[in-house]
Amino acid sequence: MKLFGSSGIRGIVNTEVTPELALKVGLVLGSRKKTAVIGRDPRVSAPMIEHALVAGLTAAGCDVTKAGMVTTPTLAYAARKYECGVMVTASHNPSEYVGIKLWNPDGMAFDSAQQEEIEEAIEKENFSRVTWDLIGKIAEDENAIRDHMDMIEGLVGKSKLRVVLDCGCGAGSTITPYLLQELGCEIITLNSQPDGHFPARNPEPNDQNLSLLKKAVVAFGADLGIAHDGDADRMMAVDEKGNFVSGDELLAIFGRFECGDKKGSVVVPVDTSLMVDDYLEGSEIIRTRVGDVYVAEGIKQCKAIYGGEPSGSWIFPKISYCPDGIYAAAKLVEIVNEKKLSELRAELPIYATKRGALPCANEKKAEFMKRAKSKLEPLGKVLDIDGIRVELENGWVLVRPSGTEAKVRITAEARENVDGIYEMAEKIVKEALK
């Protein structure tokens, strides 16, 4: 039984993720942990799933503390005082989705082995219910948000920037506006009232969904625009000219400030731009599978200084292995207080990228990847942890099966002549598809 993806358990509410499933997750977890803290994002279905989880946890004898509506990084930080953390969220997915994400006390999401143990236990109904006198107690933590804010304020300096903040009607509304105000910023808020219908925009903070933020930054003469997804584990930005800042650019900028003169290791997924390698020259760039869980695991294994994903997940291991969009927002404000974001972007090398896809039946993907690898290997150094990435003298190409569609995706990036690299890769892929 496969329940967990790269972002925990996630699916359409009452179809793929049901109260019955949540009850079983709670029973399995409660049979193995004595204490847990649970939180939820604003989506309409979250209280229902939370109640089912709490019922399962306490029925198995686990004491549960409810943190209420909080961001995922707030919940992951609160987990340090318990044996595990449980977050009800579907992150950047639309309203009809709901999910369950599980956290260790160090802020690391449950790893593959822990996930498989839960899946197997649910399938075999390997859990226990305690007698009435051993049922777990339920308490509330009213200080989870304050504790998270205090931790960040102890690490980040103050500034007087004017910031437009778009929380996307998500859980970030409960913390980021107040944190940035306490750090001295003048805050102009957009969509910063929690609403699980996400009426203002799609929760994913990408260029397409942030048109209002881009206009507002210019209209208000702001120094910076910041946006979150539904649970604020992600953070994206707009510069003072109203331009969306790409994830690769933010990854590089944060990396420069985190590494400083230490030139340590930085962990990124396989589809990250060469910009990061070149801008962070002297630092070791380690690549993992796509997914913030895998980036976090890589950071922990390599004792890296920093890591992140261009999708907007920034991981600072000095505070947690959970992507923390709240800390990232405060840190970016501190950085931009010293130098305009547009000026920081101007320092970055920009390379051309080209993407495409070709049809490939799902049942043929495994065999296709074998053939593609044999044809791509002569071109350069191959990294095959997530698709096939080939390092070329002037760039790289990544061939990766889609996880959601009957397609294989091709991505090419080059310091020059990206069309030539892409066409070469496309020709090889077409041959491997025959």
Swiss-Prot record:
* Post-translational modification note: Activated by phosphorylation.
Q: Please, which domain of life does this record's source organism belong to?
A: Archaea
Query: Which residues of this protein are catalytic?
Result: 91
| GO biological process per UniProt | carbohydrate metabolic process
Entry-linked SUPFAM superfamilies:
Phosphoglucomutase, C-terminal domain, Phosphoglucomutase, first 3 domains
One short Pfam name that applies is PGM_PMM_I
Q: Which residue positions does the secretion signal occupy?
A: none
Q: Which UniProt keywords apply?
A: Isomerase, Magnesium, Metal-binding, Phosphoprotein
Which PROSITE patterns is this protein grouped with? PGM_PMM
EC number(s)? 5.4.2.10
Q: InterPro entries, alphabetically? A: A-D-PHexomutase_a/b/a-I (IPR005844), A-D-PHexomutase_a/b/a-I/II/III (IPR016055), A-D-PHexomutase_a/b/a-II (IPR005845), A-D-PHexomutase_a/b/a-III (IPR005846), A-D-PHexomutase_C (IPR005843), A-D-PHexomutase_C_sf (IPR036900), A-D-PHexomutase_CS (IPR016066), Alpha-D-phosphohexomutase_SF (IPR005841)
Query: Which organism is this protein's natural source?
Result: Methanosarcina mazei (strain ATCC BAA-159 / DSM 3647 / Goe1 / Go1 / JCM 11833 / OCM 88) (Methanosarcina frisia)
- Its job: Catalyzes the conversion of glucosamine-6-phosphate to glucosamine-1-phosphate.
Give the family, as the similarity comment puts it: Belongs to the phosphohexose mutase family.
Say if the entry is tagged with keyword Isomerase.
yes
- Cofactor section: Mg(2+)
Known catalytic reactions: alpha-D-glucosamine 1-phosphate = D-glucosamine 6-phosphate
Q: What is this protein called in UniProt?
A: Probable phosphoglucosamine mutase
**Sites bearing Phosphoserine, chain numbering:** 91
* Molecular-function annotations in GO: magnesium ion binding; phosphoglucosamine mutase activity
How many and how are cofactors bound here?
Answer: Binds 1 Mg(2+) ion per subunit.
Keyword field contains Magnesium? yes
Q: Where does Mg(2+) bind?
A: 91, 229, 231, 233
